[in-house]
Amino acid sequence: MRNQKWIALLGINLFSAGCNSTDLSTSSGGSTVATSGGTSSSFSARPARIYSAALTSCNPMGSGSTSAIDLNLGIAARLYYSPAGQPEYTDVESYMNDGTDLGVDIFFNQVNVIPTYFSAGFPSAAGPPFETPDGSVLMEWFGIRYKSTLRLTANDQPGNYQLATLSDDGSILYLDPTGGQNPVDFVDNDGSHATQMACAKSTLAMDASTQIPFQLDYFQGPRYHLTSMLLWRRVPDGASLSDPACGVVGINTFFDTTHTPSVPQPYYESLLSRGWEVIPAENFVLPDTNPENPCFPGGGILGI
């Protein structure tokens, strides 16, 4: 059911520039999705769009610098909310299917919102935070749909990569490495919960030509703390995909939220020592629906 709704929402175009795949294979450490043979985008041929500063937000939610690192890199996102009179949804699909699109554009360099006390809402590039039609600043009961294309850079080794999410509240990562218009729930971390890690049960076979369009749907329930992080690790051939952190949940397990900003706990640092990392900003290419990043300094596409 999720796959059918996802296809209906996105249509054909999201994956038209996706990678081609050869097969699905299984190793002792879990299944591996082969994704070699992907196509490259011609960034210079993609048309520019002028964005309104009042309706655009750059790296909100305490996710780092407000500037993009490159005109064609980043993650485009849309913001959904539950208007007065509608339920306070506790799952991702309800926000995407039944929530209201606020009509704003959000850009992230990467998915790296560590556990954060979120009370100021989403600041626009013009300064004031976004408001719903009734004048409310969104601090709770909202959903975010991230879209981008995942790739390796020249600094990354080809191989099998396992993905994971850390989120508070729920999130679902969808992707279609086969290029067959069949996106799947690749990492399911849905539901109302404190910061929780969910891990993919299969790996992605990636090389320099691989480009994988993806969508990450996330929702925030009751105020104030939230988390939204996308991680990966390179897995040696035949290695197990099990990790002690997969499925672990806790308010202060991964980060100490009594500090501002939150401080990594030894449990999170041990996760990094096992090869996990937040996917770097250089690995995200903007989708064709938002080909240029208005948060890039000097890009000339962020209006007033």
Predicted regions and their residues:
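Bacterial N-terminal signal peptides that target proteins for export
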Residues: 1-7
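Bacterial N-terminal signal peptides
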Residues: 8-17
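Bacterial Sec-dependent N-terminal signal peptides
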Residues: 16-45
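Acidic/polar, compositionally biased interaction segments
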Residues: 43-304
